[in-house]
Amino acid sequence: MVFEYPKGVELIAGVDEVGRGPLVGAVVTAAVILDPHQPILGLNDSKKLSEKKRLLLAEEIKQKALAWSLGRAEAEEIDQLNILHATMLAMKRAVENLKIQPHFVLVDGNRVPELMIPAQAIVKGDGLVAEISAASILAKVARDQEMAELDKRYPEYAFAQHKGYPTALHLAKLAELGPLAQHRRSFAPVRKLLNTL
């Protein structure tokens, strides 16, 4: 499947999120406007790239993009709003943080946040649209770095290994050590644990 860009639109921002599934930390989003005169080779869905390749591409994106920005919604906001609404809010923040206002926004997935700019959702857009691929890489690198920092503060939880996702290791550590302030209270494994304490 080949994506057809909107006709006659110059500044297109791609938007993606990372971190809807984890039990801990923020959902992180990115918005990127690429420079058509400085193409970046190797852009793809961040999940299909090695960590080393993601880091290299993230630096290249930051150097070559016309504009890029990050957005986020914290664990508390996720608990208050729910993960879908918090993700939409984080995407909106990423677009609003861009130093250049895009003419059109392409969003990975099947929903678009409320924006003052025309937008379109593209299912599996992170593998089809270069701008969304770039956004997915920046968001993934940023969130992974946050998990590495959390791992330094709380090495016993092994965040560097599972990145906050509900793996068997994370669930075992959660049961053994209890949740941190950064854990999402509204997510079932954390909620169940809090109800038994």
Curated annotation (Swiss-Prot):
Recorded hits in CDD domains, A to Z, give: RNase_HII_bacteria_HII_like (cd07182)
Q: What top-tier enzyme class does this entry carry? A: hydrolase
| Residue intervals of the RNase H type-2 domain | 10-197
Q: How is the cofactor bound?
A: Manganese or magnesium. Binds 1 divalent metal ion per monomer in the absence of substrate. May bind a second metal ion after substrate binding.
Alphabetized GO MF terms: manganese ion binding; RNA binding; RNA-DNA hybrid ribonuclease activity
Which cysteines does the record link by disulfide bonds?
none
Entry similarity comment: Belongs to the RNase HII family.
Protein name, as recorded: Ribonuclease HII
What is the species of this protein?
Pasteurella multocida (strain Pm70)
Q: Taxonomy-wise, where does this protein's organism fall, top ranks first?
A: Bacteria, Pseudomonadati, Pseudomonadota, Gammaproteobacteria, Pasteurellales
Q: Which gene encodes it?
A: rnhB
